[in-house]
């Protein structure tokens, strides 16, 4: 008998495949157990080391093919740990001299090394501590005979099932085999949801307990259109959902006819539809879906899935690739936005009570200019290969923008002195995601070249509702009149100064929000590439004059529910 699990529809489509559980295995053992056959226990440990080497070599080679040599380098470091006699010998000695079982000897010795390395005031040694911790876990799994989940080694069609997907997890996903995913936690604007749309795979988030209700290898259906997961479907359900999937793909094929069409309302007003991307690997989807530019390039993904900072040269090559691929269309690059729900192990950032309100984004970059300046240099060098716009995230005060701009201009001068060509047509803007920034939009508009409204954070900060919390998800209201008023205020402030405003939050591709945003005068709608053609079809059927009237009425509503009802009455 099948089982229905409800969640939040995060990415359109229908996936049908076996479940692959991405959950932490049970690696517990009896720490006090002594062994009598010490030679046999040493052999068991040595066997686990060799098995780990074989496994890591496969993972490393697969990562190089799927993700590139830079992402594979982290596994080279892990292999070096397995060959380090200063680590291996003490473990073998502990087994021989103390009759310790292999698991205890491994964890005791590696814990000592990790503690020592983490206490050092040396970034390289702290990175080695992370390597030892990861390798120890892998060797322990072989000692205990427990298989570790490894999404990079998937070689058959699966649906990923997990508590949540971290940026590192998604960096390892092979789109050829991962048909979709379902998670316990998350909302439509969580990292895993955003990445599922970028990868163009169906996804359900916020199911609360799917990891407890699905077993490894269960056949499951992910209905990303309605938010349903069906576990072990009946034959009739399989047939019905296969038909639904075919109809979904048929509609996508029909939408392809709009790929090269203009985005223009019935009364002749043009709108610009751009794409959000995380890496150059997203470019084929951008081009296939007829994007008129890139409204958000999330550069933090260049820094993830690795054990050290990307070099200036690595960043330059990535930015150059994107700018060249877009053939002169506008590319808006957001500088490093780390913190909150996005962490880098090698930065060793302190834990904070409220990370979304803490040391992140532009705050981190201004404080740690050894991170910020190489990125700005790489961007400036790449600027001659296309139409580059640069925007700074999480700007709260005009002084933050001024300081960031001053650093950029300083690096621009340095590069020119070094003989590099730099474009003189780079626009500088900010993300508007803090209510204080929206409130002072008229002040910012005099100094920035453009605004990009990041509604994912603007909504949670304005309504004081954590977008990752299911318990307050009812307060995460994109159509709340307070949000619409802030958006209107930002757009009007930019237009008054002859500047433009885009939106790169998930709201920009939302079919209920699009009529409102069109009416408010939004210049650029930036969204997941998969949403572009649907948005184009929708906008091409709307009247700008009518949507302006709709938006003016919406900002005077009292509740989100009133706004939704108003939109539904206007747009039928």
UniProtKB/Swiss-Prot annotation:
Reaction catalyzed: L-histidyl-[protein] + phosphoenolpyruvate = N(pros)-phospho-L-histidyl-[protein] + pyruvate
Listed Pfam families: PEP-utilisers_N, PEP-utilizers, PEP-utilizers_C
Binding site for Mg(2+): 433, 457
Binding site for phosphoenolpyruvate: 298, 334, 456-457, 467
GO biological process: phosphoenolpyruvate-dependent sugar phosphotransferase system
Signal peptide as annotated in the record: none
Intracellular or extracellular location(s): Cytoplasm
Keyword Transferase annotated: yes
Keyword Phosphoprotein set for record: no
GO cellular component entries: cytoplasm
GO molecular function: kinase activity; metal ion binding; phosphoenolpyruvate-protein phosphotransferase activity
Keywords carried by this UniProt record: Cytoplasm, Kinase, Magnesium, Metal-binding, Phosphotransferase system, Sugar transport, Transferase, Transport
Active site: 191, 504
Principal place of residence: cytoplasm
EC number: 2.7.3.9
Role description: General (non sugar-specific) component of the phosphoenolpyruvate-dependent sugar phosphotransferase system (sugar PTS). This major carbohydrate active-transport system catalyzes the phosphorylation of incoming sugar substrates concomitantly with their translocation across the cell membrane. Enzyme I transfers the phosphoryl group from phosphoenolpyruvate (PEP) to the phosphoryl carrier protein (HPr).
Extra information: The reaction takes place in three steps, mediated by a phosphocarrier histidine residue located on the surface of the central domain. The two first partial reactions are catalyzed at an active site located on the N-terminal domain, and the third partial reaction is catalyzed at an active site located on the C-terminal domain. For catalytic turnover, the central domain swivels from the concave surface of the N-terminal domain to that of the C-terminal domain.
UniProt similarity note: Belongs to the PEP-utilizing enzyme family.
Record remark: domains: The N-terminal domain contains the HPr binding site, the central domain the pyrophosphate/phosphate carrier histidine, and the C-terminal domain the pyruvate binding site.
Subunit structure: Homodimer.
Entry protein name: Phosphoenolpyruvate-protein phosphotransferase
Organism of origin: Staphylococcus aureus
Gene: ptsI
């Amino acid at each position: 008998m099948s089982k229905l699990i409800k969640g939040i529809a995060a990415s359109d489509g229908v996936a049908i495949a076996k479940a692959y559980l991405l959950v932490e295995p049970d690696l517990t053992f009896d720490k006090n157990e002594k062994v009598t056959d010490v030679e046999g226990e040493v052999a068991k440990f040595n066997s686990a080391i060799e098995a780990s080497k074989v496994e890591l070599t496969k993972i490393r080679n697969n990562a190089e093919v799927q993700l590139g040599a830079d992402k594979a380098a982290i596994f080279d470091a892990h292999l070096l740990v397995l060959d380090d006699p200063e680590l291996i010998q003490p473990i073998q000695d502990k087994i021989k001299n103390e009759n310790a079982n292999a698991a205890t000897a491994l964890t005791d010795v590696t814990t000592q090394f990790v503690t020592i390395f983490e206490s050092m005031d040396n970034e390289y040694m702290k990175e080695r501590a992370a390597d030892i911790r990861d390798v120890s876990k892998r060797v322990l799994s072989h000692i205990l005979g427990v298989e570790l989940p490894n999404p990079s080694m998937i070689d058959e069609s699966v649906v990923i099932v997990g508590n949540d997907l971290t940026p590192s997890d998604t960096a390892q996903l092979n789109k050829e085999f991962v048909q979709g995913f379902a998670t316990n936690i998350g909302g439509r604007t969580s990292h895993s949801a955003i990445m599922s749309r970028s990868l163009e795979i169906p996804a359900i988030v916020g199911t609360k307990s799917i990891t407890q209700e699905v077993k490894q290898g269960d056949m499951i259906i992910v209905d990303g259109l309605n938010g349903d997961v069906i576990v072990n479907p009946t034959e009739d359900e399989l047939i019905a959902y296969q038909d639904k999937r075919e109809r979904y793909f048929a509609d996508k094929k029909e939408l392809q006819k709009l790929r090269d069409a203009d985005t223009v309302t019935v009364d002749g007003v043009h709108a610009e539809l751009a794409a959000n991307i995380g890496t150059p690997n997203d470019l084929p989807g951008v081009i296939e879906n007829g994007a008129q530019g890139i409204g958000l390039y999330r550069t933090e993904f260049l820094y993830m899935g690795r054990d050290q900072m990307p070099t200036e040269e690595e960043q330059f090559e990535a930015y150059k690739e994107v700018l060249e691929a877009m053939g002169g269309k506008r590319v808006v690059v957001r500088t490093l936005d780390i913190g909150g729900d996005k962490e880098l192990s090698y930065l060793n950032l302190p834990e904070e009570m409220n990370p979304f309100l803490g040391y992140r984004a532009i705050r981190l970059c201004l404080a740690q200019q050894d991170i910020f300046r190489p990125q700005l240099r790489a961007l400036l060098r790449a600027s001659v290969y296309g139409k580059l716009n640069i925007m700074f995230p999480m700007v709260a005060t005009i002084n933050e923008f001024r300081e960031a701009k001053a650093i950029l201009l300083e690096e621009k001068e340095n590069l020119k002195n070094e003989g590099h060509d730099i474009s003189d047509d780079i626009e500088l803007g900010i993300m508007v995601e803090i209510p204080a920034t929206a409130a002072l939009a008229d002040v910012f508009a005099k100094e920035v070249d453009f605004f990009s409204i990041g509604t994912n954070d603007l909504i949670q900060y304005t309504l004081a509702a954590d977008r990752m919390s299911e318990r307050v998800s009812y307060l995460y209201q994109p159509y709340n009149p307070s949000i619409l008023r802030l958006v209107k205020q930002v757009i009007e402030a930019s237009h008054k100064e002859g500047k433009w405003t885009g939106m790169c939050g998930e709201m920009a591709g939302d079919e209920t929000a699009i009529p409102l945003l069109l009416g408010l005068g939004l210049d650029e709608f930036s969204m997941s590439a998969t949403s572009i053609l649907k948005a184009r079809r929708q906008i091409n059927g709307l009247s700008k004059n009518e949507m302006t009237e709709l938006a003016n009425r919406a900002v005077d509503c009292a509740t989100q529910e009133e706004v939704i009802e108003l939109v539904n009455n206007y747009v039928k």
